[in-house]
């Protein structure tokens, strides 16, 4: 919802709303949700105070603040029916809004990815729905950090002490954390998409939702204390489920990106039992 004074002179309202529909459909397509839901995918409000002091989720999401009583704001000078706020020009113009929307989508994840994977739907939206090349879409997905292609992100991870010592990525929620608010925290999914196609990622999330709706355990947080039907620990089970969606063993790729199996032997046996083989595509990418 926006003030009438911002939009009464718009001459492109139809194309604007069509682009909003494309962006929201992209979120649903990637994550395996129906395009028509019982609520809007994203409901934004500009004239409700944000009591948190930080950006966040909500229905409505209130991350674009406007105080109608503060006449020093540029919005008052632009109250000519043709305001230039990003959401009135380009629905994908602010990646932060999609980061917060990602939290609201309740997508499954590896525990440490809580502030990382939520950026990934933006990559699909810009690449598939709006035609950006893959690297450009990935670069834009973390807002101002536009110099990180997937390959540059790999270098950004490989130069760390943890990578050189063969350790998992740091997930300490300190200044040393290597997942949150960083491309390298979700680049594994970009690699899966560019190596095996977007369909592999979409198939995974679709199955996650089907399993969740059927009361089969899936990991939606870092405290996965239930047992899995495959008998694996949470990390290993998710690696197996991702591998099934891609049709190949993703363990080496996910290991490269700092998520290590809990029980390598049990995971390898489950991978073999699922009829999944090693991938020369992954091998070639890792030794490239």
Go through each PLM region and give its residues:
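Residues that form generic nucleotide/phosphate-binding pockets
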Residues: 19, 23-26, 30, 207, ...
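Beta/coil-rich, acidic/histidine-enriched accessory regions frequently appended to metallopeptidases
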Residues: 224-288
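Short, solvent-exposed positions on alpha-helices
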Residues: 112, 116, 199-203, 252
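Catalytic cores of extracellular degradative/oxidative enzymes
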Residues: 1-194
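A short hydrophobic/aromatic micro-motif that marks alpha-helical segments and, especially, helix-coil
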Residues: 129, 212, 262-264
């Amino acid at each position: 919802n926006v003030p009438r004074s911002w939009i009464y002179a718009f001459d492109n309202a139809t194309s604007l709303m069509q682009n909003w529909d494309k962006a929201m459909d992209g979120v649903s397509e990637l994550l395996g949700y129906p395009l028509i839901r019982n609520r809007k995918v994203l409901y934004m409000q500009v004239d409700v105070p944000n009591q948190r002091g930080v950006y966040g989720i909500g229905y409505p999401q209130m991350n674009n603040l406007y105080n109608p009583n503060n006449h020093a704001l540029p919005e008052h000078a632009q109250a000519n029916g043709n305001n230039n706020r990003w959401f009135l020009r380009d629905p994908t113009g602010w990646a932060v809004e999609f980061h917060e929307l990602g939290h609201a989508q309740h997508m499954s994840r590896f525990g440490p990815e809580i502030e990382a994977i939520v950026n990934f739907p933006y990559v699909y939206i810009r690449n598939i729905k709006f035609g950006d090349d893959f690297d450009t879409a990935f670069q834009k997905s973390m807002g101002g950090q536009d110099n990180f292609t997937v390959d540059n992100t790999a270098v950004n991870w490989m130069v760390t002490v943890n990578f050189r010592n063969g350790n998992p990525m740091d997930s300490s929620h300190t200044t040393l954390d290597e997942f949150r608010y960083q491309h390298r925290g979700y680049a594994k999914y970009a690699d899966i998409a560019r190596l095996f196609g977007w369909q592999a990622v979409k198939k995974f999330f679709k199955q996650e939702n089907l399993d969740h709706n059927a009361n089969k355990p899936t990991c939606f947080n870092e405290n996965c204390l239930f047992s899995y039907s495959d008998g694996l620990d949470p990390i290993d089970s998710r690696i197996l489920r991702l591998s099934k969606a891609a049709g190949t063993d993703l363990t080496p790729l996910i290991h490269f990106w700092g998520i290590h199996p809990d029980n390598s032997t049990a995971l390898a046996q489950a991978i073999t039992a699922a009829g999944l083989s090693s991938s020369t595509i992954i091998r070639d990418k890792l030794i490239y």
